[in-house]
């Protein structure tokens, strides 16, 4: 008797949620990473994918214990020269995916407390206008010759 009752309750629960959207209320951050930096380098960047929640939101700030200053940056290319500039926010449309990537929009880390070493992790806390603060674990990947972040101009 108990088994049948449990089965019926499970079936009712499944029906109750059948039409429910499983989209998160808040943005969901995945694949957060950074490139390793050589000793003496004081800047780095963090990249990630942000999946918008049920409502549009804006990434408005970030901070990390690993850096004295953390800004949101975009990269513009003009006459073959890439130039970074600080931006106030990153729009996160409802239900849409936004990718922060090299040579594009990213989280800029300035005044690093030491090199970012491949295989290590560190935390960047993102602040969204609606969803509030969200700590994100960033994995440091090996550096490559094709994207030396320190070569960009500010």
Cite the ranges covered by each PLM segment.
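Bacterial N-terminal signal peptides that target proteins for export
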Residues: 1-10
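Intrinsic structural disorder/low-complexity segments
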Residues: 10-11, 152
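N-terminal signal peptide c-region/cleavage motif recognized by signal peptidases
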Residues: 18-23
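Compact, glycine-rich, soluble single-domain proteins
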Residues: 25-154
